[in-house]
Amino acid sequence: MGSPDSSSGSAQKPPRHQHQHQPPPPRRQGSAPELPPGFRFHPTDEELVVHYLKKKAAKAPLPVTIIAEVDLYKFDPWELPEKATFGEHEWYFFSPRDRKYANGARPNRAATSGYWKATGTDKPILASATGCGREKVGVKKALVFYRGKPPRGLKTNWIMHEYRLTGASAGSTTTSRPPPVTGGSRAPASLRLDDWVLCRIYKKTSKAAAAVGDEQRSMECEDSVEDAVTAYPPYATAGMAGAGAHGSNYVQLLHHHDSHEDNFQLDGLLTEHDVGLSAGAASLGHLAAAARATKQFLAPSSSTPFNWLEASTGGSILPQARNFPGFNRSRNVGSMSLSSTADDMAGAVDVSDGGNAVNAMYLPVQDGTYHQHVILGAPLAPEAIAGAATSGFQHHVQISGVNWNP
């Protein structure tokens, strides 16, 4: 007969083959919930207030335990991501709010090493449209974190969006006034202002601004086209013949920019001092084509850019003059004027003793007098443009087929 101690001990010992079922350990704060792959938590302002903050204030069950309860003002913003339950670039929290002063209604925005500063005004959060219209269910406030003490804090890129309830929904979570005075003495004042507010924390980056800048610079590079012709519209040239605009360039007829070829620049050819601009000028495409043909006709041997502006200012851009059949170098072309006839101005190239002054080479033209009109609106032959180029554009040539008296 065994001892009672041994029998009682054997009866209390459970069999080895039986397993005790224990409840799972409670989920620790900050651990990620069990969510399906690809799940993203990015609710709208209305969804945050109606489906999360409002239910939290009413102590109703939430759709999913994904928002952690953290007193935000006891931490710096860079410490909060590890306190969150879920999130990658933005994190959500339920947080209480305290008063700054016991007898006031201002919230305390101080944190560990800085403070949160409100920016802008409160944005109302409206519920979806109903039969009675859209109802205001909450407000949203934006805040920026500053390191240091106010008002000389250093601004950071940490942003907070604070959501709080309004109206009847805020009665159970907000105490906007200090405790009343009872029996001639004030009860111990509570610093709690809101039981719960919902906050979204994120760090603003400049990646978006940098991407926009890179795209804009790429578009500018693509807009650089060879043989680009830039001209003012007709309505812009209509009023350029006024007397108050002497000596200024009105039209950039052609700008050819090519880093791999000789630069051919036809800029500032026409000024009001030389010619009178006409409102009926049109179709600069012919002039651009003629200018490009002139480039091939002249074929400058120098590798330096060829600039017509140097020719118009008296710079020596041509080689020493040669005798051409049918031209007389003995004529005094300097005495000729714009009113001379074609017979008087059939002259030749004249270089004064090898100097820098380049006189005009006149082409055989039809009978008639010269008038100051812009050579626009009609196709020009490359030979005509070449003749005008060698003359430095000191005088203008009348071309057949051009209406000089519009």
From Swiss-Prot:
GO terms for cellular component: nucleus. Residues 1-11 have a biased composition (Polar residues). InterPro entries: NAC-dom, NAC_dom_sf. Residues 35-204 form the NAC domain. Residues 1-40 are annotated as: Disordered. GO terms for molecular function: DNA binding. It is found in: Nucleus. The keyword NADP does not apply. Keywords: DNA-binding, Nucleus, Transcription, Transcription regulation. GO terms for biological process: regulation of DNA-templated transcription; system development. Residues 137-210 bind DNA. Its main location: nucleus. Transcription factor of the NAC family associated with the grain protein content (GPC). Accelerates senescence and increases nutrient remobilization from leaves to developing grains. Sequences of 11 European varieties of H.vulgare tested belongs to the same haplotype while the sequence found in H.spontaneum, an ancestor of the cultivated H.vulgare which has a higher GPC, belongs to an other haplotype. The NAC domain includes a DNA-binding domain and a dimerization domain. High grain protein content (GPC) is a desirable trait in breadmaking and pasta wheat varieties because of its positive effects on quality and nutritional value while Low GPC is a desirable trait for barley malt and beer production. This is NAC transcription factor NAM-1. The gene is NAM-1.
